């Protein structure tokens, strides 16, 4: 039985899908105006792992993750680079795909873009106006927060808290609102900015309405799981809930999931603070699987500190698992012990996708594998577990010269010519091949 920590209820809940055997899942994707940083990547990796585990447990997952390709940040970047907003979005979508592929992330079932849904967004806003949940003001359209039942329930805030925080605002936009806490559904455009025609004049959608429309248009009014980083609880996901439920009268999502931050020196990694490392740069010195494995060392909801030591530890541990996977697996299977490991792994992951505990079971299994010689079914079980974390080992093929040297060493040992055997062993070490003689035969690892 899979249990999920639901941000809305703030407790572990048994997962019950809307439709047996199927899951509808929407995860907020990047605003494509720059390379993603390691903190952004954690969210992508965390929900990819969750999706993979659902599939491991037999579910068919419709996994949607959007590209926000209409945003003020994209407009500003276009001015800086002297290109169009569309060209900015295309450039960084391509960069995102390249980065997450290196991290072993599966493509979403669909990656919708805001520009594909402009007509749907306008209809959605019109509907909210007709229902009295939204109003036009000088070409902008705002959502009436006070009309929303239990607004900000996801963030555990009250409307009174928000109104108190907004008191005293005197900026131009606030003057156009009925209430300072109302948020934009549609923004009128300034001269020269990218815009779309609408009943309220040329403009572009607000950030929050984009995800509501893409989710409901593709997956329907109510989905199983909505996910994203912890910083999206408020205001983004809060506003998604308000506008979606105002339109449909139904629960927007049955489970809300949020991943923790990546910290540097215990401070959240963010572009606004300037303390970030892009995945594009990190991959110049790190293997993508190492970074991916680093994320798996901590529960997805908890913050994780990005340090050189932590990353190097992940690299060492991943190498150990790779060497384990490359054993010959020519022996017999201990079916009961293998099943015990599978059961322990499922128990760990069923408890809110606890990757850290799941990885602990994988290492226990690796230790067991290295203590004997088992058959290919054990190797497959190890591969299946690792694949959930996006770790896929490609077995290295020794070139003919090295294979010949290993065979000659075996013959020398059989003839008790240990001097020659040792010379060959030392020669292989210089080529990065380390041999291990066991009761079940010779094994090798690549340093």
Curated annotation (Swiss-Prot):
Q: Which residues form a coiled coil?
A: none
GO CC annotations on file: cytoplasm; cytosol
One Pfam annotation reads DALR_2
**One Gene Ontology term from the biological process aspect of the record:** cysteinyl-tRNA aminoacylation
Concerning NCBIfam families, the annotation shows: cysS (TIGR00435)
Q: List, alphabetically, the SUPFAM superfamilies matched.
A: Anticodon-binding domain of a subclass of class I aminoacyl-tRNA synthetases, Nucleotidylyl transferase
Subunit and partners? Monomer.
Q: Where does it live in the cell?
A: Cytoplasm
- UniProt motif 'HIGH' region: location: 30-40
Which residues bind ATP per the record? 271
Stated name of the protein: Cysteine--tRNA ligase
**Cofactor(s) listed:** Zn(2+)
Name the Gene Ontology molecular function terms of this record.
Answer: ATP binding; cysteine-tRNA ligase activity; zinc ion binding
Q: Which family does it belong to?
A: Belongs to the class-I aminoacyl-tRNA synthetase family.
């Amino acid at each position: 039985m899979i249990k999920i920590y639901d941000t809305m209820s703030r407790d572990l809940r048994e997962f019950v899908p809307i439709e047996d055997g199927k899951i509808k899942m929407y995860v907020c994707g990047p605003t494509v105006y720059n390379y993603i940083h390691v903190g952004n990547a954690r969210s992508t990796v965390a929900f990819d792992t969750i999706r993979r585990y659902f599939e491991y447990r037999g579910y068919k997952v419709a996994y949607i993750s959007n590209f926000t390709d209409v945003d003020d940040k994209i407009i500003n970047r276009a001015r800086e680079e002297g290109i169009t907003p569309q060209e900015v979005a295309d450039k960084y979508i391509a960069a995102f795909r390249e980065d997450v592929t290196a991290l072993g992330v599966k493509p979403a079932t669909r990656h919708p873009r805001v520009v594909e849904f402009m007509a749907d967004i306008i209809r959605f806003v019109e509907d909210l106006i007709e229902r009295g949940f939204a109003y036009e003001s000088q070409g902008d359209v705002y959502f009436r927060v006070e009309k929303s039942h239990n607004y900000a329930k996801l963030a555990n805030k009250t409307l009174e808290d928000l109104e108190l925080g907004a008191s005293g605002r005197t900026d131009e936009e606030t003057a156009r609102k009925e209430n300072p806490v109302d948020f934009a559904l549609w923004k009128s455009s300034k001269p020269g900015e990218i815009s779309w025609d609408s009943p309220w004049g040329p403009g572009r959608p607000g950030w929050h309405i984009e995800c509501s429309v893409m989710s409901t248009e593709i997956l329907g009014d109510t989905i199983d799981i909505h996910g994203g980083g912890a910083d999206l609880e408020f205001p983004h996901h809060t506003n998604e809930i308000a506008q979606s439920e105002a339109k449909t009268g139904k629960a927007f999502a049955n489970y809300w999931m949020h991943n923790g931050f990546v910290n540097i020196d215990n401070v959240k990694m963010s572009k606004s603070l300037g303390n970030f490392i892009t995945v594009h740069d990190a991959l110049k010195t790190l293997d993508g699987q190492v970074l991916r494995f680093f994320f798996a060392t901590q529960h997805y909801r908890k913050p994780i500190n990005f340090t050189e030591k932590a990353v190097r530890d992940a690299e060492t541990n991943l190498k150990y698992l790779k060497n384990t996977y490359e054993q010959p697996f020519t022996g017999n299977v201990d079916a009961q012990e293998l099943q015990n490991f599978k059961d322990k792994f499922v128990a760990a992951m069923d408890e809110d996708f606890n990757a850290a505990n799941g990885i602990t079971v994988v290492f226990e299994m690796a230790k067991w594998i290295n203590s004997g010689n088992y058959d290919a079914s054990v190797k497959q079980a190890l591969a299946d577990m690792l694949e959930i974390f996006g770790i896929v080992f490609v077995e290295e093929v020794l070139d003919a010269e090295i294979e010949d040297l290993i065979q000659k060493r075996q013959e020398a040992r059989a003839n008790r010519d240990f001097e020659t055997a040792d010379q060959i062993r030392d020669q292989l070490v210089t080529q990065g091949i380390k041999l291990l003689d066991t009761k079940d035969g010779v094994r090798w690892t690549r340093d």
